[in-house]
Swiss-Prot record:
This is Alpha-ketoglutaric semialdehyde dehydrogenase. NADP(+) binds at S159, N160, K185, A186, H187, S188, G240, S241, E393. The keyword NADP applies. Pathway: Carbohydrate acid metabolism; D-glucarate degradation. Its EC number is 1.2.1.26. PANTHER family: ALDEHYDE DEHYDROGENASE-RELATED, SUCCINATE-SEMIALDEHYDE DEHYDROGENASE, MITOCHONDRIAL. One of its GO terms (molecular function) is 2,5-dioxovalerate dehydrogenase (NADP+) activity. SUPFAM superfamilies: ALDH-like (SSF53720).
Length: 526
């Protein structure tokens, strides 16, 4: 394994005009880890985009099998990093080794899942309408459509998942699977981790015969805007704050050539607890709820940050159980000093906001890098008025509980909520007749609606949706988890009256790739 040198990854080379001055910081004590990195220059941003463009011109013509083998090889090379990867990531993020071991498996599993998607071939969306020269009153020409990669993609690493939403995370894998090249902007919170994974990707490129420049990575806090504005970048993926996401989104839309910008940003992920479920198992639901909003120190974008139920003795007992469980919750290390500061500011803002009160706090922190869990209660008027403080995601181990008068008030209040990544209904069988209207409402509000589970687990699969209406994401038509994520980096192209000699294999007569296609309105592999 290569030693840390802190240089950019551009066109298969390590380059740096600036001396390595950006320090990687230990998340536990805020001391330097010893890893140093170079701030990318504007010229290096341009070099990375140029390299990605030149690579795309070749990489877009690789076969689905070649790309699948490439993704499999990345998975192998990441596994070959061994425990060193988790150890460095733990140092930079404060996350437990067991969590990072699971996250490594998530990354390699995701790579292999996309490889399966490529071999299956349905991502092409192949549609063929053969010519009907005798059709009256007008003949029909031969039309054949499939999807191709949009071009070089900029990807921004997320702070809270140093592996799964980072260098070889969902956005990168989806773009590579689509036939797009990538310029990855490493997150400042785990640059050494990113460097290790980028080295693995570079080895996979060499071993697979993939064009150099298919993957590039740059470091630095002042290059994101330049990357999004670069004319050769054709799409971008982002996971982070609402403020950061919208700033980059606006840059992407204000370019001379606007580009798709897929940002996952802000969600409070409401959990609705139904009356009969509380009567049957209220204490267990409370314990599971607190465990969910404290998981990973509350640093999940799917953390349940809002808990709502209808006033009743059972709901009062449920709140008491929430309080008791929260008080036993232990402090955990947050990802970095900036994240902890933002969390504390969010807590202070709620403490000073009318209609909110803190009703329970977890055990006091023992380290300067730890966050204390909190449970707030808010008046139903806060929900009914659409108070922005209620809808502002406080990233960390906290949640807000609200009791409403009745079902009509519940539905009225939920209408005031903005878009969400998830919405959860905790219900028993006898609650289901009342849940239908609630389900319809939440379906309009969220990308994923759960029953009797908690949203902090996000399965990587074909059916998963990790997205939702604004401000959960900048574009509710996509997902950043699961094989559907590839759709964000594809565009359709149609060939009309084109010779079989010139057509791509995916559209040729005889179906040489043996994939499922829509031919004259019929799904077939013929």
């Amino acid at each position: 394994m290569s030693e840390n040198n802190g240089k950019q990854f551009i066109n298969g080379q390590r380059v740096a005009a600036n001396a390595p001055t950006i320090e990687s910081i230990n998340a536990t004590d805020y001391q330097p880890t010893g890893y140093l990195f170079s701030q990318a220059t504007l010229d290096e941003v341009d070099q990375a985009a140029q390299a990605a463009y030149q690579a795309f011109l070749k990489y877009q013509h690789t076969t689905q099998q070649q790309r699948a083998d490439f993704l499999d090889e990345i998975a192998i090379q990441i596994e070959n990093l061994g425990s060193k990867l988790q150890e460095v990531a733990a140092q930079e993020t404060g996350l437990p080794l067991v969590r990072l071991q699971g996250e490594t498996g998530r990354v390699t599993g995701q790579l292999r899942l996309f490889a399966e998607l490529l071999r299956r071939g349905d991502f092409y969306g192949a549609r063929i309408d053969t010519a009907l020269p005798e059709r009256k009153p007008l003949p029909r020409v031969d039309l054949r459509q499939y999807k191709i990669g949009v071009g070089p993609v900029a990807v921004f690493g997320a702070s809270n998942f140093p592996l799964a939403f980072s260098t070889a995370g969902g956005d990168t894998v989806a773009a590579l699977a689509a036939g797009c090249s990538v310029v990855f902007k490493a997150h400042s919170g785990h640059m050494a981790t990113a460097e290790l994974v980028a080295q693995a990707i570079e080895k996979a490129i060499l071993n697979s015969g993939i064009p150099s420049g298919t993957f590039n990575m740059i470091f630095g806090s002042r290059v994101g805007a330049n990357l999004v504005e670069h004319p050769l970048i054709q799409a971008a993926g982002f996971t982070g704050s609402l403020e950061g996401g919208m700033a980059l989104f606006n840059l992407a839309q204000n370019r001379p050539q606007p580009i798709p910008f897929f940002a996952e940003m802000s969600s409070v992920n409401p959990v609705i607890v139904m009356p009969e479920a509380l009567n049957a198992r209220g204490e267990k639901v409370a314990q599971d709820t607190v465990a969910s909003f404290n998981m990973g120190c509350g640093q999940f974008c799917t953390k349940p940050g809002l808990i709502i139920g209808i006033k009743s003795p059972a709901f009062d007992q449920f709140v008491t159980a929430l309080i008791d469980t929260t008080r036993t919750a232990v402090p955990q290390i947050m990802l970095n000093q900036g994240t902890l500061k933002s969390y504390q500011q969010g807590i202070d803002a709620l403490l000073n906001e009318q209609g909110f009160k803190c009703i329970a706090s977890g055990q006091a922190p023992e380290l300067i890098s730890q966050a204390q869990p909190h449970l707030f209660q808010a008046d139903q008027s806060v929900l009914l008025s659409g108070n922005p403080k209620l809808q502002h995601e406080v990233f960390g181990p906290m949640s807000i509980v609200i009791a409403v008068d009745d079902e009509a008030t519940l539905l009225n209040g939920l209408e005031k909520l903005a878009g969400q990544l998830t919405a959860t209904i905790i219900a028993d069988e006898s609650d289901l007749p009342q849940a239908k209207e609630l389900l319809n409402l939440l379906t309009r509000k969220a990308g994923r609606v759960l029953f009797n589970g908690f949203p902090t687990g996000v399965e990587v699969s074909d059916a998963m949706v990790h997205g939702g209406p604004f401000p959960a994401t900048s574009d509710s038509r996509g997902t950043s988890v699961g094989t559907g994520a590839i759709e964000r980096f594809l565009r359709p192209v149609c060939y009309q009256n084109t010779s079989q000699v010139l057509l791509p294999d995916v559209l040729k007569d005889g179906n040489p790739l043996h994939i499922t296609r829509l031919v004259n309105g019929v799904l077939t592999q013929n």
